[in-house]
């Protein structure tokens, strides 16, 4: 945009650095990429996450809680990818900070987007650690991603079942009813 170029030129001149890189968002992708992904995840959490619903359904035991956190994070990422192409690029294009196999496996199930190449090994390990019934249950959760209460309740049940069946060495990190609208332009009943 011409206005952005003009502002950048003014900033370089005022900063006495006329040769400064005016295309920082492209030239420093290694640094800014993970930052963009983190910012997108924070925005998705603010828009689609209800702390009360999460707290009500979060399992008490540590193993189930860790699984629940992975599924919850995958749900938010999938919602972002489903509606916003730029978010998809940021989340899948700059994923290097975590090695959460269950999160990426669930992300694939919930969004229909394949995990990036550097995550495929941890996804394969997570998939191999789950029984066919657990894999089916994970796929079933995909239909609930837009309804936080139902998703959280079903995810908690899935985690309670899975926590005894998922080996510890599988890579992973550890209210009011409302529906998320079917389209990004819709209204969210939580927000009025």
Report residues per predicted region.
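Segments forming glycine/polar-rich beta-alpha architectures that bind adenosine-containing cofactors
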Residues: 162-192
